[in-house]
């Protein structure tokens, strides 16, 4: 059995990390594991296992005939059985299946705005879903949506899992050791960094030595500009630091004391699982399937989204008792290692692959 993971880029986002994790994890579980990135390469290319077959299409437009031909020929030459398409790459995968009807197509839905599914564009997805052999959804809301909206019978919920990357530390965080709060999230509106900044500004009134560290891709857009403007306007330049995309996230988290997610909407965020693997005490908004990871107060703090005061209080609570915070972090680490493991997820994936190809 030969399987190709299809993804739009290898920038350090959640769906991209999942595609790389699957390609790497399946190397010794199936006959051959491949990854194709369609539009762009990125930081995560360096994390691919040397035994993963790799293709970069450099696709320039939605229907790029040259890219379609290259992928079609690659799949033919390598005798690939399954395309596992992540996110918006479903369209290209569908075109390839039309050219090779015997090919099996699995779509992985990573949609990050699961709180706002009513506004999700679905016409093209609905059309293409007729050609899907299976859909994996990253949270239960997306699973229900796929079952009721799309034209495919086989749908299942598959939680994300995180793996520690072994990249050497290259990013030295600013601030005082033991007083760092980290937010691992690309600079997108649904991540609601502005709410976090407002809450952290209030924290600084009583805890001026603490610092906030934002790690994630900067798209240099209006949202990004609003974050920098807030920092400058409120004179937070010596307390809040922005690093952009980083390949050494596991090493970065080892330098931090508290992990935070302030999102308005999520699927099942990889950042939450990465915080857990690092043993960090975590504060997260109660969106998507975050409550499946943090089930009670022993495992972290779940707060309402867009609630600055609740976020401020949660940060101050951990800061006021770091010993208890460390215990909470250890409980979450145990939970993530046992309930969101790589081994159990890959076993489910391989079983599904075997089912659709038999």
Regions found by a protein language model. Name each.
Residues 85-92, 109:
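Short His-centered aromatic/hydrophobic patch
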Residues 13-21, 188-205, 212, 222-225, ...:
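A conserved mid-protein helix/loop that constitutes part of the nucleotide-sugar donor-binding site
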Residues 245, 264:
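Aromatic "clamp/platform" in nucleotide-sugar-dependent glycosyltransferases that forms part
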Residues 296-297, 301-309, 317-323:
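Conserved acidic donor-binding segment of nucleotide-sugar-dependent glycosyltransferases
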Residues 132-157, 162-167:
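A short, active-site helix/loop in glycosyltransferases that binds the activated sugar's phosphate group
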Residues 106-134, 149-150:
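A conserved, positively charged/aromatic
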Residues 281-284, 294:
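Short hydrophobic beta-strand element within catalytic cores of glycosyltransferases
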Residues 4-6, 174-191, 197-200, 213:
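Conserved donor-binding/catalytic core segment of Leloir-type glycosyltransferases
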């Amino acid at each position: 059995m030969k399987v190709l993971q299809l993804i739009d880029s290898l920038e350090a986002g959640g769906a991209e990390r999942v595609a790389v994790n699957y390609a790497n994890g399946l190397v010794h579980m199936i006959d051959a594991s491949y990854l194709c990135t369609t539009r762009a390469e990125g930081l995560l290319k360096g994390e691919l296992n040397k035994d993963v077959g790799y293709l970069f299409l450099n696709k320039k437009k939605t229907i790029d005939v040259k890219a379609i031909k290259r992928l079609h020929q690659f799949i033919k030459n390598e005798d690939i059985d399954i395309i596992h398409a992540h996110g918006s790459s479903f369209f290209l995968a569908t075109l390839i299946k039309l050219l090779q009807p015997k090919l099996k197509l699995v779509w992985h839905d990573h949609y990050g705005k699961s709180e706002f599914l009513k506004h999700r564009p679905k016409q093209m997805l609905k059309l293409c879903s007729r050609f899907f052999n299976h859909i994996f959804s990253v949270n239960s809301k997306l699973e229900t949506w796929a079952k009721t909206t799309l034209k495919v019978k086989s749908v299942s919920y598959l939680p994300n899992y995180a793996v520690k990357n072994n990249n050497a530390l290259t990013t030295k965080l600013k601030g005082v050791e033991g007083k760092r709060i980290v937010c691992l999230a690309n600079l997108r509106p649904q991540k609601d960094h502005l709410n976090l900044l407002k809450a952290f500004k209030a924290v600084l009134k009583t805890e001026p030595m603490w610092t906030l560290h934002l790690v994630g891709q900067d798209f240099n857009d209006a949202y990004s500009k609003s974050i920098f403007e807030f920092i400058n306007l409120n004179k937070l330049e010596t307390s809040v630091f922005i690093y952009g995309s980083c390949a050494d996230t596991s090493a970065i988290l080892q330098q931090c004391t508290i992990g935070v997610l302030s999102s308005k909407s999520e699927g099942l965020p990889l950042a939450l699982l990465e915080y857990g693997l690092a043993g960090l005490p975590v504060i997260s908004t109660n969106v998507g399937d975050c409550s499946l990871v943090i089930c009670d107060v022993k495992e972290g703090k779940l707060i309402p989204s867009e609630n600055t005061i609740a976020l401020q209080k949660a940060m101050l609570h951990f800061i006021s008792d770091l010993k208890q915070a460390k215990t909470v972090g250890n409980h979450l680490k145990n939970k993530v290692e046992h309930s969101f493991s790589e081994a159990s997820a890959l076993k489910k994936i391989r079983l599904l692959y075997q089912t659709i190809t038999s």
